[in-house]
Amino acid sequence: MTVWTGNDAHLDMFNEIADDFIADHPTVEEVTFEVLPFDNYIEALTVQLAGGNPPDLGWIFERNAPEFIEAGVLTDLAQTLEEAEDYGYDDLTDAATELWREDDGLYAYPFSTSPFSMFYNADMFEEAGLETPTELYEAGEWTWDAVRESGAQVVAEGAAPHGFVVRDFEFQLWDNLATLWRGFGAEEWSSDGTQCGMAAPEMVEAFTFFHEAVFEDEAHPGPGQSADFFVGDSAMTVTQISRAADLEDEQFNWGVVPLPEGPAGDHQVVGQGAIGVFNASPNAEVAAEFLAHMTNEENSRTLAQFFPPPRESLLNAEVLGETNPLLSEEQLERVVVDGIATGTSIPTHVNFSVLQDTIRAELDAMWTDDADVEAVLQQVCDVAEPLM
């Protein structure tokens, strides 16, 4: 199975689940988890598929779901999961599995439906004499404006090298900024994927806000600046709640809150990771059986300590709290349960790989201090819409 996590706690958990499967399947000698770099995961996986050397199973980003399903490279898992002993197929929620279905088939299992959230370093806020995001949230004042203001202030006070950072964005993965622009009421394209929304007034407002946060306020690191919240480089970071695992051994006080409100109100965003079985695998049948084992009700409880499951019975703070010692029930309710209930997916498109590269290239003109935001976004649409 190809994965994009190198986290030891994740891999140890996967290997324990695999060992149980091997014990009950004498013809299976080994289950291996191949870590591919996050930044070029899909490219590396595609090379394996095109080269006739596919993995048996692989993780798939939600943004690439329509492409993989339309390409016909994934095995329909519905019958295998329905017939697996003690699986509880009907427990899978329609909302979580919708992206991975076509007709009556289920072509990947969304093992993680993980809301984006804002982690913060409470020690840095205390040093700067600022209210924490939790205090702002509870006062009804948790907004993108507050993020920008407090991000600039915590840097000005010398309490943090950087204010806030949209993790994994790095001025390359532009679609991660959906965590911001959804709060402005912006959409990257129409619901049928045929019309570009990148030049709409709401998107211009969102990108103007972000551009000013980077180049005027210096609240967010600029191009070429690396900032990792988890090693103390920033006071806040936008990332998925599953990243809480990276805080297990941290030496600073931290908290986590939902994404802030924008001019369009409260708009939460979720990301999904799914596991698919590849048709071209010589072990596709047993790979599907392993997937059924890995994601049965019992193992879903185990996975839930890092990856919010698509199971109705497990999506409540009390159950999630049993395997999430790092997060309080209140945090789980606010960020995970409510986020999954109300959140929308980050951008997906049947032609996403081409659009991702095209839009990234056009947005390069945005990342200078004197950029014409509206003109850049119009150019994005001029180039991207014909590809939709």
Predicted region positions:
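Extracytoplasmic "Venus flytrap"/periplasmic binding protein-like
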Residues: 20, 24-91, 108, 127-128, ...
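C-terminal capping/gating helix-and-loop segments adjacent to ligand/active sites or protein-protein/ligand interfaces
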Residues: 101, 309, 330-383
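Extracytoplasmic/periplasmic solute-binding protein
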Residues: 101-111, 116, 126, 143-195, ...
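Glycine-centered hinge/linker elements that transmit conformational signals in sensory
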Residues: 150-152, 191-222
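Mature extracytoplasmic/periplasmic domains
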Residues: 227, 242-245, 275-353
